[in-house]
């Protein structure tokens, strides 16, 4: 077994099973391991929403069991400034953002990394299902081994310099293997439910949360032919491809086919819907994206073919990427369904994640 006794690793301990097993694996390899519990949200901390208090208790029990020290730190101010305000700005603009990606870039692999350095850490580690490959001076982000949990999509904006100081101990394992290890160690987190959704929203209704910060602007729901068939409470509560929660079922003069959101008309504050999950207006030939993050630098070629995802867990889609000033134009081999401005498009060369950007617009 290789040893790393001269290297101190600060593990982000969330109170979940993945980070718990990550800490164990690193200690077993001989690293000097300490944990850090990050608190990123201060607005409310009831157990029905964010579970920071119970998560901290679980994190402490895991560290006690493993015999490692647990530090705690609040990055709430950084989260508000660098992530949450951007989240609100995007919704004001009628887009659908993904705060987890920005949180990884700005908090988990920047604020946390800086804090870990101050603690004397040589490296950081997280429980993400991703891997890395090193070649010369470059560190490449690679897909995790478990296709059902693979998380490189959320890590595409993390710069290569940060990845070079990061370990992903469970990235080469399947989730069931991680739970088995935790169960054999009798860790309190071995059967803990995976966290889902955005932490600061938790299990509450999304529209109720958003109303707390942004005033609703009701408007018309219109068909793809321009006929008004209902009212919406705010475009920000809806996303492209949405079927549930429109409140327009059983309309006279229309068949029973389900309605889907195909456009958010910001100029007229209208929600445009069409019937059928395969309606042509749900599909796009390509997209434009900005705010590009290339993990290992801008590609040498201004035009190249690769694979891309426009949402988490989507199968890789073959495409052509044309690099332009300030962004890219992406043309897919096959038309893509429900491509959503504000979400991220992430590029791959096989198992290697190249980077990605924020979707600005689509073209049909």
From Swiss-Prot:
Region spans: Interaction with tRNA: 149-151, 311-312
SUPFAM superfamilies hit by this protein: Adenine nucleotide alpha hydrolases-like (SSF52402)
Top-level enzyme category: transferase
Keyword annotations of the record: ATP-binding, Cytoplasm, Disulfide bond, Nucleotide-binding, RNA-binding, Transferase, tRNA processing, tRNA-binding
Segments of this protein annotated with the region Interaction with target base in tRNA: 98-100
Residues annotated as the enzyme's active site: 103 (nucleophile), 199 (cysteine persulfide intermediate)
Cell compartment(s), UniProt: Cytoplasm
UniProt: ATP binding residues: 12-19, 38, 127
An annotated GO BP: tRNA wobble position uridine thiolation
Reactions that this protein is recorded to catalyse: S-sulfanyl-L-cysteinyl-[protein] + uridine(34) in tRNA + AH2 + ATP = 2-thiouridine(34) in tRNA + L-cysteinyl-[protein] + A + AMP + diphosphate + H(+)
Domain of life: Bacteria
Family the entry assigns: Belongs to the MnmA/TRMU family.
PANTHER family on file: MITOCHONDRIAL TRNA-SPECIFIC 2-THIOURIDYLASE 1, TRNA 5-METHYLAMINOMETHYL-2-THIOURIDYLATE -METHYLTRANSFERASE
Task of the protein: Catalyzes the 2-thiolation of uridine at the wobble position (U34) of tRNA, leading to the formation of s(2)U34.
Full protein name: tRNA-specific 2-thiouridylase MnmA
Organism: Hahella chejuensis (strain KCTC 2396)
């Amino acid at each position: 077994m290789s040893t790393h006794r001269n290297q101190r690793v600060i593990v982000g301990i969330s109170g979940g099973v993945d980070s718990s097993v990550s800490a164990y694996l690193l200690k077993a390899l001989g690293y000097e391991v300490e944990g850090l519990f990050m608190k990123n949200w201060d607005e409310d901390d009831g157990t029905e929403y964010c579970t920071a208090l119970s998560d901290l208790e679980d994190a402490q029990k895991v560290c006690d069991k493993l015999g490692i020290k647990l530090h705690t730190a609040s990055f709430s101010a950084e989260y508000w400034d660098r992530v949450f305000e951007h989240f609100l700005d995007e919704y004001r603009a009628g887009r659908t953002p993904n705060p987890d990606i920005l949180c990884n870039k700005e908090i988990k692999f920047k604020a946390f990394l800086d804090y870990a350095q101050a603690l004397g850490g040589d490296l950081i580690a997280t429980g993400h299902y991703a891997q890395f490959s090193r070649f010369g001076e470059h560190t490449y982000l690679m897909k995790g081994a478990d296709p059902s949990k693979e998380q490189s999509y959320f890590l595409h904006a993390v710069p290569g310099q940060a990845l070079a100081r990061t370990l992903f101990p469970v990235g080469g394992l399947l989730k069931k293997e991680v739970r088995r290890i935790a169960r054999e160690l009798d860790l309190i987190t071995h059967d803990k439910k995976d966290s889902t959704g955005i932490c600061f929203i938790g299990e509450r209704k999304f529209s109720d949360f958003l109303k707390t910060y942004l005033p609703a602007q009701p408007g018309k729901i219109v068909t793809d032919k321009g006929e008004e068939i209902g009212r919406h409470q705010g475009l920000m509560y809806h996303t492209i491809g949405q079927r549930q929660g429109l409140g327009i079922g059983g309309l006279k003069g229309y068949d029973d086919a389900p309605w889907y959101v195909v456009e958010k008309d910001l100029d007229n504050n209208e929600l445009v819907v069409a019937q059928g999950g395969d309606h042509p207006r749900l599909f796009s030939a390509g997209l434009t994206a900005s705010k590009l993050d290339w993990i290992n630098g801008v590609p040498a070629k201004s035009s190249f073919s690769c694979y891309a995802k426009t949402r988490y867990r989507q199968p890789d889609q073959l495409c052509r990427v044309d690099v332009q000033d300030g962004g890219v134009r992406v043309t897919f081999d096959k038309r893509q369904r429900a491509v959503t401005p504000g979400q991220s498009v992430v590029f791959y060369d096989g198992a290697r994640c190249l980077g990605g950007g924020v979707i600005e617009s689509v073209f049909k």
